[in-house]
Design a protein with these regions (language model features):
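Short, intrinsically disordered terminal tails adjacent to the first/last structured region
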Residues: 1, 135-139
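"…centered on the first transmembrane helix and the immediately adjacent amphipathic helix/loop
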Residues: 1-63, 79
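Residue-level signature of the transmembrane alpha-helical core
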Residues: 19, 51, 55, 80-88, ...
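Short helix-capping/hinge motifs at transmembrane helix termini and TM-loop junctions
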Residues: 30-32, 66, 98, 125
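Interfacial helix-loop-helix junctions of multi-pass membrane proteins
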Residues: 35-43, 87-115
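Membrane-interfacial alpha-helical segments at the cytosolic side of multi-pass membrane proteins
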Residues: 53-68, 114-125
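Internal alpha-helical transmembrane segments of multi-pass membrane proteins
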Residues: 68-81
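Membrane-interface capping segments at transmembrane-helix boundaries
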Residues: 123-135
Length: 139
């Protein structure tokens, strides 16, 4: 029985925050009126938007994977590969949604945001693990 349908295993619910972020990214990627276009005062506002969106997506995926008790390897694979693949897919799809266009530098910004998000999560995960190990060794 698939994971999402197993009555005894409801781990997929842990990924609802990631799904909501994914819906937001999809919406922002396909709308005609791009909010970042009006932010002409900020250099590379569009790229910053991509980095922040995918940083949040990677953090959510990693955090959701942790709550779902995924293995560390699977957690990092999902948190890295899913945003990278989805970011590339969205850039390709934008070609078919004028006035949007496919810009591979946007995908690079997605990848940078993903890398920063995963790195931040790794620092948090290492810190939390060391804190847990210290408290268990003191008992």
């Amino acid at each position: 029985m698939p994971l999402c349908c197993a009555s005894s295993n409801k781990r997929w619910w842990h990924f609802v925050p990631s799904l909501l972020v994914l819906i937001g990214i999809t919406y922002m990627s396909l709308i005609k009126d791009v909010p970042f276009a009006v932010m002409g005062d900020i250099p590379l506002a569009d790229k910053w938007g991509h980095m922040v969106a995918y940083l949040v997506f990677a953090l959510c995926l990693a955090g959701d994977g942790l709550r779902a008790r995924m293995s560390v390897r699977a957690l990092y694979m999902v948190a890295i590969l899913l945003p990278l693949i989805y970011g590339g897919l969205m850039e390709w799809i934008q070609y078919y949604f004028p006035p949007r266009m496919c810009e591979w530098l946007d995908w690079v910004a997605d990848a940078i945001g993903t890398a920063i998000g995963v790195a931040l999560f790794a620092v948090y995960h290492i810190w939390k693990s060391s804190k847990t190990n210290q408290s268990s060794s003191q008992q």
